[in-house]
Each structure stands twice: as C-alpha cells, then as structure tokens.
C-alpha cells in the first residue's frame, strides 16, 4: 500500500468494525414535528365528512350495483358514464371498446387511489 493512504490509524480493522457496529446500533431518526403534523392533518382531512371522495361515495352507496353513486360520478367522469348504463340495465357483461376501457380503468384507478373529489351540482 501507499504510505499516504495508511497515514491515519482510522482504517484499522478494529476501528472499521467499531464504526459499523455504531452505525447498526444507532436508533432510527425520529420524524420531525412538522412531518408528524402534516400526517395528522392529512388523516383529519381524509376523515372529515366535508371532503367526500368517490371511494367514500361508492362505499356508502346502498343501491344495487352502486347506481346512485355512479349517476353522481358520471357527470365528472367518462369512465363512470361508461359503467352506468350497463349497471342500470343489470347487464351480466359490459362491452367496452379500447378507449372506453382505458377511461374505465383510469376511473377505477382514481377511485382506488382515492383522488377524485365529488362535486355535487344541485
């Protein structure tokens, strides 16, 4: 080895293993108070009744085939509109072309991710 690399005694086997041991035994960093408050705010927003999302609307709908919630959502989403007519007719299958399929999958993905806010226009 080159002498300049080993000038310090930090690279000895004992010092290296001690540094690794210390790193492993260190407790995980606690999230900051600001991060914790942001998480609390997000949970409160999700749990408030004022912020009704498509997922909560569909879950709380007691009509057969969830038609009432789909009627409300069909004013906002083409995918919901594509699902509404076959659901109202109680069809056993839903025929969709390629574009309608993409729209329905996008709608269902948004419902699953809980990202659609319901806008009631009455």
Curated annotation (Swiss-Prot):
It is found in: Host nucleus. InterPro entries: Baculo_Ac102. Keywords: Host nucleus, Late protein. Disulfide bonds: none annotated. Residues 1-35 are annotated as: Disordered. It comes from the Viruses. Its main location: host cell. One of its GO terms (cellular component) is host cell nucleus. Interacts with protein C42; this interaction suppresses C42 'Lys-48'-linked-ubiquitination and subsequent proteasomal degradation. Interacts with proteins P78/83 and E27. Nucleocapsid protein that mediates the translocation of G-actin from the host cytoplasm to the nucleus, which is fundamental to infection. Participates in regulating nuclear actin polymerization as well as the morphogenesis and spatial distribution of viral capsid structures in the host nucleus. Suppresses 'Lys-48'-linked ubiquitination of the viral protein C42, thus forming a regulatory cascade with C42 to control P78/83 availability as an nucleation promoting factor (NPF). This is Protein Ac102. The gene is Ac102.
């Amino acid at each position: 080895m080159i002498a300049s690399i080993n000038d310090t005694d930090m690279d000895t086997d004992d010092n290296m293993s001690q540094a690794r041991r210390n790193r492993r035994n260190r407790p995980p960093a606690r999230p900051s108070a600001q991060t914790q408050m942001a998480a609390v705010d997000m949970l409160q927003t999700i749990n408030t009744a004022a912020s009704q999302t498509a997922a909560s609307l569909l879950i709380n709908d007691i009509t057969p085939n969830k038609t009432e919630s789909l009627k409300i959502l069909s004013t906002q989403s083409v995918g919901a509109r594509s699902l509404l007519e076959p659901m109202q007719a109680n069809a056993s299958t839903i025929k969709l072309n390629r574009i309608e399929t993409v729209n329905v999958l996008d709608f269902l993905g948004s419902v699953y991710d809980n990202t659609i806010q319901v806008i009631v226009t009455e």
